[in-house]
């Protein structure tokens, strides 16, 4: 009997060990943000982003260890208002280099520029493993902090192999949104992100992922190869409004900008002085993209503005900040407005 019990115990231990080993390996790349923030009061909206390190974040959600083997790496620890090209490039290179070493990636990130990072990574990563961005609207010290559940759900999503067929994703407040479509819609609400022109990809509930939309398979290669890039071309955004000044156009050109995105009114329209300055810039080898400050809809080519005549590019479905990301990458390949227009129609 004792020998039988010992054999049974050994079998159970062996099965437990196999189960633990069989868990997917998820790499957590930390960049800071509110999810890593802390404040002096549990009820105050004042806090400092990027105070908590990745190990502390992971240890604060022990439930994640029941579904995956997590390894964390702190790339930077900043508020995402300070996100920059160097961090983007480091993230893309890291994911591409380590794709075969892990089963998926979770990237902790501030919400301010998360949509830009998500779009950049969607265009520059060739890894077909799940890549999930996650953030929080309340710091870890706040009552009702949303970060822990968001992180847990992001790990759940990263362990779903089929998520790798959907490009870069974001997981927050139980919602799954495609990185190309995600947009921040509120300055303070917990339900902060949406996909205004396409709808959410799915949702996560009780540790399970449900998808609303069919996947759009990624190609074998990234849209843009950034493996040898150390920086991106300089591109700025000019905001349009009643009686707008063209001074920002002049300033961007003096700084050596290779491209300018116009955050236009309506269907990408521009105030006359801004229009004239951008038309002049387009003639002088600066790529000009028309977008709109309106959060939904498309900026259509040759609508009220004759893009063919002035050499402008229409941003299609992209808002100004995402149009800037695509223009930066496009300029690493070409300065031809027609070729760049084709890229905007494709991506």
PLM feature spans:
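Internal gly/pro-rich beta-alpha loop/helix module
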Residues: 134-205
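Short, acidic/small-residue loops that bind anionic groups at enzyme active sites
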Residues: 118-149, 155-159, 283-292
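Accessory alpha-helical/coil subdomains and C-terminal extensions
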Residues: 24, 29, 53, 57-62, ...
């Amino acid at each position: 009997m004792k020998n039988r019990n010992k054999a049974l115990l050994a079998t159970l231990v062996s099965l437990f060990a196999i189960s633990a080993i069989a868990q997917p390996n998820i790499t957590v790349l930390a960049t800071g943000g509110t999810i890593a923030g802390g404040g002096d009061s549990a009820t105050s909206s004042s806090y400092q982003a990027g105070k908590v390190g990745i190990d502390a974040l992971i240890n604060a959600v022990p439930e994640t260890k029941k579904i995956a083997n997590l390894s964390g790496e702190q790339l930077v620890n900043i508020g995402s208002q300070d996100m920059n090209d160097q961090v983007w490039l480091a993230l893309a290179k890291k994911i591409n280099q380590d794709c075969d070493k892990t089963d998926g990636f979770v990237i902790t990130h501030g919400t301010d520029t998360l949509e830009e990072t998500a779009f950049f990574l969607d265009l520059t990563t060739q890894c077909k493993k799940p890549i999930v961005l996650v953030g929080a609207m309340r710091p870890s010290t706040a009552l009702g902090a949303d970060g822990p559940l968001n992180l847990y759900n992001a790990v759940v999503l990263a362990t779903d192999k089929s998520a790798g067929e959907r490009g870069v994703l974001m997981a927050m407040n139980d919602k799954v949104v495609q990185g190309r479509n995600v947009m921040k819609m509120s300055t303070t609400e917990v339900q902060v992100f949406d996909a205004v022109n396409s709808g959410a990809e799915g949702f996560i509930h009780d540790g399970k992922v449900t998808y609303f939309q069919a996947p759009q398979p990624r190609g074998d290669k990234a849209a843009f190869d950034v493996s040898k890039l150390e920086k991106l071309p300089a591109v700025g955004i000019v905001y349009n409004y009643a009686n707008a000044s063209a001074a920002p156009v002049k300033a961007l050109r003096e700084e050596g900008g290779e491209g300018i995105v116009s955050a236009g009114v309506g269907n990408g329209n521009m105030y006359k002085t801004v229009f004239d300055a951008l038309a002049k810039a387009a003639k002088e080898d600066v790529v000009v993209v028309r977008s709109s400050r309106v959060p939904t809809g498309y900026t259509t080519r040759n609508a009220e503005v004759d893009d063919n005549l002035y050499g402008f590019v229409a941003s299609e479905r992209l808002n100004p900040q995402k149009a800037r990301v695509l223009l930066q990458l496009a300029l690493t390949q070409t300065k031809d407005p027609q070729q760049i227009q084709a890229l905007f129609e494709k991506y």
